[in-house]
Swiss-Prot record:
Protein name according to UniProt: UDP-N-acetylenolpyruvoylglucosamine reductase
Signal peptide from the UniProt entry: none
GO biological process, alphabetically ordered: cell division; cell wall organization; peptidoglycan biosynthetic process; regulation of cell shape
Gene name per UniProt: murB
Organism: Rhodopseudomonas palustris (strain TIE-1)
Subcellular location: Cytoplasm
One Pfam family named in its UniProt record: FAD_binding_4
Broadest EC class assigned to this enzyme: oxidoreductase
Length: 309
């Protein structure tokens, strides 16, 4: 299944583009679930200037989606119309410390940012050690773990709007709430400044070890999974509601509710995106019927179903 190839026209309109532009590029290898169709266009910018140039020249009617690390994402089987942007570690992966401030590019792994802070004897960012994503995704969804979240440490973030204009957002402008940012969905975040707190190496390492031990004991980290599937309802745990509804181990096609942690869906090997999304919706329906609680997706679902591209 493929889309009309618009890359020749885009390249002709952007003679100074330095990044990589590919048509009908498979996205499944770029997501942790390893499912989904192609992007009509996949663009990997060389750096911030290249990203701004691309957006400023891209026709306004062409939709744009930034993929992030692909750890909390389902790309539907029909693929993604328009442009998918993937920020590379080479151009957007910096992580360095100045005083008590950690500078992190959007493509920097959350775990690496925690390690960089720890090396500078800065605490407060240990929770990132257990999050399987990048800083760009953390900004977009206010990623958190172990009682801490991005809103607790963010100073400000840099982003580009759909016209290619560079903008700076302080913490308040991000409009953070639980696993959500109210910032314009069209923004593409490129970097952030995070506030650390001086702490002893032993204290920081103990917290990071605790985070890692919890992940290994409680989460199916060696499976093809997208992380936590549903947001925790206020005062409740999504996994408990899912378990109470009898969904532990539930299967649809090649998708399964994890036996280890009910709020994780896994690709057992041959799942389609439709299998995973259908399983998630089945879980939501059973939980609603059993407890009256309507679970909200934490995993982002993008693209079109098979046959719709």
């Amino acid at each position: 299944m493929s889309f009309p190839d618009i890359t020749p026209d885009l390249k002709a309109a952007m003679p100074e583009l330095r990044g990589r532009l590919l048509g009908n590029e498979p996205l499944a290898p770029l997501t942790w679930f390893r499912v989904g169709g192609p992007a009509q266009v996949l663009f990997t910018p060389a750096d911030e200037d290249d990203l701004g140039y691309f957006l400023s020249r891209l026709p306004a009617e062409i939709p744009v989606m930034c993929l992030g690390l692909g750890s909390n994402l389902i790309v539907r089987d029909g693929g993604l119309p328009g442009v998918a942007i993937r920020l590379s570690p080479r151009g957007f992966g910096e992580h360095r410390v100045e005083g008590e401030v950690v500078h992190a590019g959007a493509a920097a792994l959350d775990k690496r940012v925690a390690e960089t802070a720890a090396a500078a004897q800065l605490g407060g960012l240990e929770f990132y050690y257990g999050i399987p994503g990048s800083i760009g995704g953390a900004l977009r969804m206010n990623a958190g773990a172990n009682g801490r979240e991005t809103k607790d440490v963010l100073i400000d973030a840099t982003a580009y709007d759909r016209s290619g204009t560079r903008k700076l957002f302080d913490n308040a402008a991000m409009q953070f709430s639980y696993r959500h940012s109210g910032a314009d969905p069209a923004l593409i975040f490129t970097s952030a400044r995070l506030r650390g707190t001086p702490a002893t190496p032993d204290h920081i390492r103990a917290k990071m070890n605790e985070v890692q031990a919890h992940r290994e004991l409680a989460q199916p980290i060696r499976e093809k999974t997208g992380g936590s599937t549903f947001k925790n309802p206020p005062g409740q745990s999504a996994w408990r509601l899912i378990d109470a509804a009898g969904c532990r181990g539930l299967k649809i096609g090649g998708a399964q509710v994890s036996e280890m942690h009910c709020n994780f869906l896994i690709n057992t090997g041959e799942a389609t995106a439709a299998d995973i999304e259908t399983l998630g919706e089945t879980v939501r329906a059973r939980v609603k019927a059993q407890s009256g609680v309507e679970l909200q997706w934490e995993i982002k679902r993008i693209g079109v179903a098979a046959g719709q591209s």
